[in-house]
């Protein structure tokens, strides 16, 4: 093998590497004057030229060398074929040429398939999608796993390639296959924070309840990696599109998943909201839709369900397993309360700086949750009263409560402003006290920021409630 071989060819997906340090791929400038093959060249020289042409992506020279007798499935010291290398750099044009010349799309090296290599390639999703589509058109199996039991769809989900994921499923890829650690494609997408892929996988029938080997569901994996929006999506709400494409033919699925469907999803979300009552929406969201008829027969409303005691659950025929789901969902909806009663009298009189800062942080966090809740309600409420099909009481009752909320928010804003002024006064006195040792400026600045954020959050919450009030009055 030539001495100028490339070291460090792109490693196979999943972190698998070859024991050989010399893969046989040579990188360097290819002299264009040597590209025209005059007569027969020694086979080793042809191979070297072939490797150079592959490295720089010279399609015309690759074709010329293949015409001169180089095998399209020739392997080099690393063990990769030309097609595998072309797939690893997402060179769709080279992949097409090699496949047209008869390259084996199902080749694998140490459980590393060409399709896996393409799905984990470094390149644009457009080029990766083209490569994957070409390989699938030549009957590459989308369910063959690597040594770590990861399938192509897992690599595509991990790397954030939504269209590739959908295309693989359309060609028969199993959505709920698990790797050696129990990860599914959905788990990988949740771990990496790819919201669009999470939604697409749910639409394609992914099971969000499958656990990893250490007992974690995708929602918990998302939470552990601080992807809170995905955590909320997977842990509480049920995607209205879940499993929608499972029963379609391959042709219909390919047509649907490769077209823009934003308008369709908006229409679906709206119709889902208005077609069910609040009780049905809640039960469907926590996977208890089978209880709908039972609760309706007993005239149990959502408000009644959420305030039931344990004996009432049993009396109405709700099993302990279903009770746990309802209570868990209710717990998710509750805002954490600050227990002042747990503080000793001494701390109440002379609270420490850390405890006071913790109090402000909790207060700010709760205000943020309240603002988000009001924003979600404003977004979800239909603008036309004729489209409301839920069981609603008189809107006057809602307006009255909103007025009380606005008043309370205004009172809270006023009290926080008083608190801020008091703390500012204390801070000024401490700074002017010659006997006081100054704290680091950074700490002072941080505390000031917390106070400002708290005040702004409270004022913002009051403003949102005011808007909510106006909305109800208009309706």
Curated annotation (Swiss-Prot):
Which InterPro entries does the entry mention?
Ankyrin_rpt, Ankyrin_rpt-contain_sf, Asz1_SAM, SAM, SAM/pointed_sf
Major subcellular site: cytoplasm
Extent of the ANK repeats: 45-74, 78-107, 110-144, 148-177, 181-210, 214-243
Gene3D superfamilies per UniProt:
Ankyrin repeat-containing domain (1.25.40.20), Transcription Factor, Ets-1 (1.10.150.50)
Give the keywords, sorted: ANK repeat, Cytoplasm, Developmental protein, Differentiation, Meiosis, Phosphoprotein, Repeat, RNA-mediated gene silencing, Spermatogenesis
Query: Where is it localised?
Result: Cytoplasm
Q: Which BP terms does GO give this entry?
A: cell differentiation; male meiotic nuclear division; regulatory ncRNA-mediated gene silencing; spermatogenesis; transposable element silencing
Question: Which stretches make up the SAM domain?
Answer: 272-334
Q: What are the GO cellular component annotations?
A: pi-body
Q: What residues bear Phosphoserine in this entry?
A: 17-18, 20
What segment(s) does the record annotate as region Disordered?
1-25
| Cited function | Plays a central role during spermatogenesis by repressing transposable elements and preventing their mobilization, which is essential for the germline integrity. Acts via the piRNA metabolic process, which mediates the repression of transposable elements during meiosis by forming complexes composed of piRNAs and Piwi proteins and governs the methylation and subsequent repression of transposons. Its association with pi-bodies suggests a participation in the primary piRNAs metabolic process.
Q: How does it assemble?
A: Interacts with DDX4, PIWIL1, RANBP9 and TDRD1.
Under what name is this protein listed? Ankyrin repeat, SAM and basic leucine zipper domain-containing protein 1
């Amino acid at each position: 093998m030539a001495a100028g071989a490339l070291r460090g060819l792109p490693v196979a997906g999943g972190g698998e590497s070859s024991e050989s340090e010399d893969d046989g791929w040579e990188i360097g400038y290819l002299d264009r004057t040597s590209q025209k093959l005059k007569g027969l060249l020694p086979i080793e020289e042809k191979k070297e030229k072939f490797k150079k042409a592959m490295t720089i992506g010279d399609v015309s020279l690759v074709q010329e060398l293949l015409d001169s007798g180089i095998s399209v499935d020739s392997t080099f010291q690393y063990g990769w074929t030309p097609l595998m290398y072309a797939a690893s750099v997402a060179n769709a044009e080279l992949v097409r040429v090699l496949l047209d010349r008869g390259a084996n799309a199902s080749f694998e090296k140490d459980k590393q398939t060409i399709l896996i290599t393409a799905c984990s390639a470094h390149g644009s999703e457009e080029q990766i999608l083209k490569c994957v589509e070409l390989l699938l058109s030549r009957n590459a199996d989308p369910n063959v796993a690597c040594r770590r039991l990861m399938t192509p769809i897992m690599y595509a989900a991990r790397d954030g390639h939504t269209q590739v994921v959908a295309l693989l499923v359309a060609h028969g890829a199993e959505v709920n296959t698990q790797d050696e650690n129990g990860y599914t494609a959905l788990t990988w997408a949740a771990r990496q924070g790819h919201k669009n892929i999470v939604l697409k996988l749910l639409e394609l029938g992914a099971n969000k309840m499958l656990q990893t080997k250490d007992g974690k569901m995708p929602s918990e994996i998302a939470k552990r990696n601080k992807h809170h929006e995905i955590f909320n999506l997977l842990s509480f709400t049920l995607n209205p599109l879940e499993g929608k494409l499972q029963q379609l033919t391959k042709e219909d699925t390919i047509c649907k998943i490769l077209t823009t469907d934003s308008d369709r999803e908006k229409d679906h979300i709206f119709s889902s909201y208005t077609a069910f009552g609040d009780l049905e929406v809640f039960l469907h969201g926590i996977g208890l839709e089978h209880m709908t008829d039972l609760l309706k027969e007993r005239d149990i409303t959502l408000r009644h369900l959420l305030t039931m005691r344990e004996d009432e659950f049993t009396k109405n025929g709700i099993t302990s397993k279903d009770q746990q789901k309802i209570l868990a969902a209710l717990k998710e909806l509750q805002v954490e309360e600050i227990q002042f009663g747990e503080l000793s009298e001494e701390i109440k009189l002379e609270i420490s700086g850390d405890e006071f800062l913790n109090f402000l942080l909790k207060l700010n966090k709760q205000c943020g949750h309240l603002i988000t809740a009001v924003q979600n309600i404003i977004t979800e409420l239909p603008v036309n009263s004729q489209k409301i099909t839920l069981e609603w009481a008189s809107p006057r009752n809602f307006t009255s409560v909103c007025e009380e909320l606005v008043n309370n928010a205004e009172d809270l804003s006023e009290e926080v402003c008083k608190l801020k002024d008091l703390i500012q006064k204390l801070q000024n006195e401490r700074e002017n006290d010659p006997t006081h040792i100054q704290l680091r400026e950074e700490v002072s600045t941080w505390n000031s920021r917390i106070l400002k954020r708290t005040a702004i959050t409270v004022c913002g919450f009051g403003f949102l409630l005011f808007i909510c009030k106006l909305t109800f009055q208009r309706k």
